[in-house]
Amino acid sequence: IFHTTDFAQSKPKGKIIKLALLNTMANTLETEAQLLNPLSDIEGYDVEITFFTPSAILNSSAIKIKEAEPNADISKYEHRIKFHRSLEDFNPEEYDGAILTGAPVASEPLQQREEGKGVTYFEEYIATLDKIKQSNTPTLAICWASHVALNHFYEVPRHKREQGKLTGVFNVLNQKPEHKLMNNVGDGFDLPVSRNYLSDEALLQANVIPLASSEETGTALAADKDGPFIYMTGHLEYDP
């Protein structure tokens, strides 16, 4: 794996895959390590990663660095400033694929900001989803990102779990073994899950292709019928 800042000095040995990683998680470094580790095992390919951050988060990182106490840990803010590009510069046509992480904003509404509520970077995020859709760039939307995308494209709402947060590792069954993403998966796989919300199952199944599910998780992996998005409500990237 090569980051764009050192790719020019590197000597790739295989076919190059260019990926964009939009990271909206608070645990910036841990999230990126979890996502990059499996990418390093792709035999015969070198992966060039470009990190992106919504401009509002980049601006906030710069402010937090400036205002930090002398002994404060500002490594994750410095990392964003040094290695991440602003989301407003993202052109999906320059990449072979994209990954959209979750975000620690589960309690915020999925729709546009109103009366000061909602995610500060919502408009920029939605514009990014539209650009990806228009360019048909293969994209994995994880957890919160999947909920936002499903709501934006198909008006699929989400519901808070009455039983409380669903946490654990669940075996999800392969519902579409003939699908190109699932033909080597076998009967199913274990999926780490940590979430308070579930997408409306009836509307979800009416608009996308369910790929994997279980009774506990509902649809855990789905794909556009005619589009570039893969929606994953769990976290395959989590460490064992």
Question: In which residue ranges do the predicted regions lie?
Answer:
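Amide-donor transfer/coupling interface in amidating biosynthetic enzymes
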Residues: 1-58, 63, 88-90, 94, ...
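Intrinsically disordered, low-complexity coil segments
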Residues: 40, 58-75, 111-120, 134, ...
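Glycine-rich, highly charged phosphate/nucleotide-binding loops
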Residues: 68-93
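Short, flexible loop segments at the rims of nucleotide/cofactor-binding pockets, characterized by
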Residues: 74-78, 115-119, 169-170, 188, ...
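Secondary-structure junction/capping motif
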Residues: 83-86, 119, 223
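Short, Asp-centered acidic motifs that coordinate Mg2+ and/or phosphate
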Residues: 97
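Cysteine-nucleophile active-site neighborhood
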Residues: 100-176
